[in-house]
Amino acid sequence: MSHHPDLSVSLDQLLLRKEVRVRQQGEWLKRHSLPLVSFTVNMPGAVKLNAASQTVMDAGMRAIQELCQKTGWRQVACQLLVEKTGPEAFVVIQAPSASMLKKAMMKIEREHPLGRLMDLDVIDVDGHIISRQGAQLPRRRCLLCERDAVICARSRRHSVEALLAKIEEMTHDYSCCA
């Protein structure tokens, strides 16, 4: 995976983008009064916008559209953002409830070949993020060793290079087989 220095992002840039994203989420909730899917890509390292993150975003958006077609849920609004901090999307979906929508998003995260690289947050109309624990679902597993991903990330158990190599393999296999 090539690392173009102009695409590297700092922690400050990531935190600033997160602040802006939270504000945008609030605006979307106010405008639509429906649950919101806030989609970002889990990408380790300083470069968040690359071919792999774009592949994951495209695959995730297709999976969300297929889910809506299959369930009859209406996709009311959608916006894709290509930021230096990584691709993002906001999707407003008219689902029976925010918790049902979260369960469906977690099913994509769990079953899609690239789902472990997708962060599909669901925010209810009151602005609360529906958590995995709140939906009684297990925490994410590490890409490399199947332990709790949060513990591996905090302890830096695996190198960024090893994680990026695994992601490159996953996105390559997906692109070849999709």
UniProtKB/Swiss-Prot annotation:
The keyword Transferase applies. It is an enzyme of class 2 (transferase). Keywords: Nucleotidyltransferase, Transferase. Disulfide bonds: none annotated. It catalyses: apo-[citrate lyase ACP] + 2'-(5''-triphospho-alpha-D-ribosyl)-3'-dephospho-CoA = holo-[citrate lyase ACP] + diphosphate. GO terms for biological process: prosthetic group biosynthetic process. Pfam families: CitX. InterPro entries: CitX. Its EC number is 2.7.7.61. The keyword Cytoplasm does not apply. It comes from the Bacteria. Transmembrane segments: none annotated. GO terms for molecular function: holo-citrate lyase synthase activity. Transfers 2-(5''-triphosphoribosyl)-3'-dephosphocoenzyme-A on a serine residue to the apo-acyl carrier protein (gamma chain) of the citrate lyase to yield holo-acyl carrier protein. Belongs to the CitX family. HAMAP family: CitX. This is Probable apo-citrate lyase phosphoribosyl-dephospho-CoA transferase. It comes from Vibrio cholerae serotype O1 (strain ATCC 39315 / El Tor Inaba N16961). The lineage of its organism: Bacteria, Pseudomonadati, Pseudomonadota, Gammaproteobacteria, Vibrionales.
